[in-house]
């Protein structure tokens, strides 16, 4: 669920995000400043709000830290892999001629990798921690950060040929599928976070307990919640070590 506490994984992710960006301030593309003045102010506001929220949220919730491996750990693995790809993107940029085309190019087939990779990584970290606050903050950041990068990319590659109709249809369908899948995950996590918070607020004598028990030789995840600790209700139990938390 949601647990307050220091997140060392959050700190690691922030360091992986900030260190190359700090180095980049000394290696900006020579024409970068002329593009900055054209940035959409609304997108810039979303970007700044998202950055502030993420920097705080990933450090104050311990749900992002390592815990007993289970199927849900795949989200953390994916998040780490995306951040490693992000570092790879920066290594390629620093070894290039450091032009605007290098800065806004794709990496491993991922468009505007400098923006999309960290946004996706923090979103997956939010799923791993089952933390709606980080998911929401990442969406806000993504709207601004990826939006700004996409607009700059169009300016930089202004001579790029338009893609065919089939390519554009596939792109729309693919994006729509991603929105539906990850939007659904976000809603489910948000609903569970809301129920947990509401239970803590409305019941000082309540109970909120989760863990793993051995049943018939198989480790199973359980969740117990109730407004009265003397009369709790088991609301989640299933076979295998996997947990949506």
Q: Which stretches of residues belong to each language-model region?
A:
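Membrane-interface helix-loop junction between the first two transmembrane segments
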Residues: 22-39
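Membrane-helix boundary elements
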Residues: 49-77
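Membrane-proximal helix-loop-helix units in multi-pass membrane proteins
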Residues: 68-120
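Membrane-helix boundary connector in multi-pass membrane proteins
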Residues: 102, 119-135
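An N-terminal hydrophobic leader/cap segment in hydrolases
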Residues: 180-211
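A short loop-to-beta-strand scaffold at the N-terminal edge of the catalytic core in hydrolase folds
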Residues: 214-225
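Short substrate-entry loop that stabilizes the transition state in hydrolases
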Residues: 231, 240-245
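Hydrophobic beta-strand anchors of alpha/beta hydrolase catalytic cores
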Residues: 234-235
């Amino acid at each position: 669920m949601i647990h307050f506490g220091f997140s060392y994984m959050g700190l690691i992710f922030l360091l992986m995000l900030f260190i190359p960006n700090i180095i980049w301030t000394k290696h900006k593309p020579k024409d970068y400043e002329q593009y900055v003045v054209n940035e959409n102010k609304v997108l810039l506001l979303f970007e700044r709000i998202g950055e502030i929220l993420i920097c705080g949220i990933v450090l104050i919730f311990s749900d992002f830290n390592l815990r007993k491996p289970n199927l849900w750990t795949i989200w953390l693995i994916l998040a780490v892999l995306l951040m490693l790809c992000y570092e790879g993107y920066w290594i390629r940029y620093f070894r290039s001629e450091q032009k605007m085309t290098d800065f806004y190019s794709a990496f491993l087939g991922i468009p505007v990798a400098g923006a999309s990779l960290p946004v996706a990584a923090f979103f997956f970290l939010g799923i791993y921690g089952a933390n709606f606050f980080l998911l929401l903050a990442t969406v806000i950041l993504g709207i601004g950060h990826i939006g700004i990068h996409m607009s700059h990319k169009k300016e930089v590659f202004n001579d790029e040929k338009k893609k065919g109709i089939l390519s554009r249809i596939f792109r729309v369908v693919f994006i729509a599928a991603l929105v539906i899948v990850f939007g659904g995950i976000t809603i489910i996590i948000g609903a569970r976070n809301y129920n947990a918070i509401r239970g803590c607020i409305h019941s000082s004598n309540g109970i909120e307990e989760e863990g793993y028990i051995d049943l018939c030789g198989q480790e199973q995840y359980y969740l117990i919640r109730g407004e009265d600790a003397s009369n709790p209700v088991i609301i989640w139990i299933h076979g295998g070590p996997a947990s949506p938390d």
